[in-house]
Design a protein with these regions (language model features):
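Mid-domain alpha/beta scaffold segments of enzyme catalytic cores
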Residues: 1-143
């Protein structure tokens, strides 16, 4: 059995999700894990998991969202993570590729989401680009 462990089907780029899902199933992909990583895609991913038996989700805020995420957003995320067919927190982490102007915000958001994952006993999907050392240092603080 094949499982697609990381895709972004909840973004608006797909005109025909039914076709994409059908093709995956015909190719032998039995389960699809959709990673929602911003405010726009959280509910869209959950909707997909409700519509398709083969779709599961991970929910979280990508590091590029660090300056946009509020404490209220994190509370909403925490509630959504308790939803059926949620299998993890992600895609979360650090991304220094395009600049380092919001590093501290990224680190704070990453740690807050790791704390939520730890509390809810959920695995995480890590995004780390040009930030390996900081990512590892932060991860060492968590189980």
């Amino acid at each position: 059995m094949f499982i697609d462990t990381h895709c972004h089907l909840s973004i608006e780029d797909y005109d025909n999700i039914d076709y994409v899902i059908k093709n995956n199933l015909e190719a032998g992909v039995k389960k699809i894990i959709v990673s929602a990583c911003n405010k726009r895609t959280l509910n869209a991913a959950l909707d997909l998991s409700s519509k398709y038996d083969c779709v599961y989700v991970t929910l979280g805020y990508h590091p590029e969202e660090a300056s946009l995420v509020t404490n209220e957003d994190l509370e909403i995320l925490k509630k959504l993570l308790k939803t059926c067919k949620v299998v993890g927190v992600g895609e979360i982490g650090l991304d220094y590729h395009y600049g380092k102007e919001n590093i501290e915000l990224q680190k704070q958001l990453f740690e807050k989401q790791l704390s939520i994952a730890e509390e809810l006993k959920l695995p995480v999907v890590i995004h780390s680009r040009d930030a390996v050392n900081d990512t590892i240092e932060i991860l060492k603080k968590y189980d």
